[in-house]
Amino acid sequence: MATSTETISSLAQPFVHLENPINSPLVKETIRPRNDTTITPPPTQWSYLCHPRVKEVQDEVDGYFLENWKFPSFKAVRTFLDAKFSEVTCLYFPLALDDRIHFACRLLTVLFLIDDVLEHMSFADGEAYNNRLIPISRGDVLPDRTKPEEFILYDLWESMRAHDAELANEVLEPTFVFMRAQTDRARLSIHELGHYLEYREKDVGKALLSALMRFSMGLRLSADELQDMKALEANCAKQLSVVNDIYSYDKEEEASRTGHKEGAFLCSAVKVLAEESKLGIPATKRVLWSMTREWETVHDEIVAEKIASPDGCSEAAKAYMKGLEYQMSGNEQWSKTTRRYN
């Protein structure tokens, strides 16, 4: 009889395994994108990179969630495996320490799964759901062990704090900001791109991704250095949000027609700009693609200025800025290949 591990591995085999070179682990584009194939993004000067442990971590983390999360059907299992949440984490944080990347994969995976749950809830129900999880994440309240979202979050945060309490605790509040943004009623009344980008900086979890990257890389920046990164992070949030919105638009537009009228409400840069500019959806996506490349140029310019400044730049700050670049390039690579959007 097969062991549970072998059963999980067999179930996951068609969807999760990647081949990657030992020295340069780049993710293969094994999925032909079906989302807006007539729209070609402008060329980018950046290259993506993937964490070298992507295959083993993906198998480990997917196996954990297959064993512990209550998926309602095999179709839901397949959808989960196709999404490759650990892969996107390894693309976001390719420079993460080997003994920390699995923490980041588990956290982003459970947050993605919770986000899917919220699509079928009203804002009030979603807010109550998240408010229950926040004190559990802090360790102030013990979880109900019959509810996967509760014990998974509790055990994960406890293990992260045991590994590095200082940097783990820096991830907590940004995570809560992200969770609150998911049920923010403001998303129902956003009609201007600038307003949308301000909201999306919280909803895309930019502060969460930044803090989680510092945890996963073991980076300790001074308070002054963190403050000095605000403009760079805000620029990064715009690029991340819009690239994600371009690729996820078709999936989210469909969800808005089939999910809860609040939880699945379509709030996207594509929709906002199309309505504001009176352009069609394909034209709006082309305009947004040009904007993303301009934000990449802005990132490079800010980084060059910081490195050339008379005050200099610490090695930790340089690593952090390079990490932000990899977040953006990695997000684009995952967004254009994941079956979650394509």
From Swiss-Prot:
Phenotype when the gene is knocked out: Reduces the production of PR-toxin and leads to a large increase in mycophenolic acid production.
GO molecular function annotations of the record: aristolochene synthase activity; metal ion binding
Residues marked Important for catalytic activity (site): Y92, F112, F178, W334
Enzyme nomenclature, EC number: 4.2.3.9
Substitution effect: N244L: Abolishes catalytic activity
Enzyme class: lyase
GO biological process, one term: isoprenoid biosynthetic process
Binding annotation for Mg(2+) 2: D115
Annotated Mg(2+) 3 binding sites: N244, S248, E252
Positions with a binding annotation for (2E,6E)-farnesyl diphosphate: R340, Y341
UniProt KW keywords: Lyase, Magnesium, Metal-binding
Sequence positions that bind Mg(2+) 1: D115
Top-level taxon of the source organism: Eukaryota
Catalytic activity as recorded in UniProt: (2E,6E)-farnesyl diphosphate = (+)-aristolochene + diphosphate
Record bears the keyword Cell wall biogenesis/degradation: no
Pathway: Sesquiterpene biosynthesis; aristolochene biosynthesis; aristolochene from farnesyl diphosphate: step 1/1
Names of required cofactors: Mg(2+)
Manner of cofactor binding, per the entry note: Binds 3 Mg(2+) ions per subunit.
Matching Gene3D superfamilies: Farnesyl Diphosphate Synthase (1.10.600.10)
Family: Belongs to the terpene synthase family.
Function (record text): Aristolochene synthase; part of the gene cluster that mediates the biosynthesis of PR-toxin, a bicyclic sesquiterpene belonging to the eremophilane class and acting as a mycotoxin. The first step of the pathway is catalyzed by the aristolochene synthase which performs the cyclization of trans,trans-farnesyl diphosphate (FPP) to the bicyclic sesquiterpene aristolochene. Following the formation of aristolochene, the non-oxygenated aristolochene is converted to the trioxygenated intermediate eremofortin B, via 7-epi-neopetasone.
PANTHER family cross-referenced by the UniProt entry: BETA-PINACENE SYNTHASE-RELATED, TERPENE SYNTHASE
Summary of subunit composition and partner proteins: Homodimer.
Protein name: Aristolochene synthase
